[in-house]
């Protein structure tokens, strides 16, 4: 991700908890990546115009404090752009307990309404929400479908044995994954 964004900005840095991930990013892509938590990074007092979190907020044990740390490191009118799934989406509702994003390592589940409230209480305003279309392998999609429709597992297993599907990618949008755009509420705006 850093390799894609770096040519389009004046400066870029990333956070990665994996030492291997940091070393790899530095060695292969010449990226500035800190091997530390957001809490420790906030102590550096570095300010950013934009913070991007891709599919990570649901993994934090305390996403509320994480958003507070992000607010601390954002410049005035800075942007937080993040992705996560909407537990209140139509697709999540119709699949119920078989919803494929209900996983042990997802510690929190958010609706658009709760995310707006959580951000606003921490001086960030979500001003745009858009659907996030993903490109996935057919094999990966079939794995997910097996979990959603367990009674059709044998059909999905048979399709997975067709070799052409192992390397075929498709775009998928179940209208449950969203990109959220939030702006730090400026002090001037708060004084009005």
Regions found by a protein language model. Give the residues of each.
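Acceptor-substrate binding/catalytic loop of class I
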Residues: 99-113
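A C-terminal cap/extension of S-adenosyl-L-methionine-dependent methyltransferases
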Residues: 130-192
